[in-house]
Amino acid sequence: MNVLDTIYQLMMSGSIVGLFIQVVPITCLVGVIYAICRYNKIKKQGCSAMWGTEIMRLLFVCYLTGLINLVLVPNNLWTYIWFYLRNGYSGCEIAPLFSGGFNLVPTFLKYHTGEFTIGRWVRTMLVGNLVMFVPMGFFLPFVSKKINPRNIFAFGILTPIVVEVLQPIIGRSFDIDDVIMNFVGIIVGYFIAVGVKALIKKA
């Protein structure tokens, strides 16, 4: 088995790592297009670029591209795309629009009342949803001067809510656990960025 076969099997595994690898190519493509367009714009304007900020913006664009493809496209879309590219089209079973479900009761309440057991998969999903949005909170202070301690909490709660409201439309599910963990991830990322910026100023 060669390297490409190994990567393909990992992509088709349905694991978090596999889903991440599925969107790496489109993320890199968008990043390259953005970098070229941004470079040409700066060159045309004849202004000096703050390369630290520009790199942060590029990384943020790549991150957003990956995030959108992970949470705002129908389930299994990229799985079928990669299967088609490798094996040819054989039909697909993407969830129909407006077919998602709703979970409005947080897992910790279900666990507290004894109606739910937090297994390994649930813990992985909870931690994954937190970690997935840490870069969002981290990049924002570097790419936007409008983000501050007064509005980061509003942004942190509104963004996950918007994402979750859209998910049932594309056949996914609204999950209050995702809203909570995404919010925590954004706030954690923001304060990590605040700490990093403070260290940079002292250096």
Predicted feature residues:
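Non-cytosolic membrane-interface motifs at loop->transmembrane helix junctions
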Residues: F83, S173-V184
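Bulky hydrophobic segments
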Residues: N2-G171, F191-A203
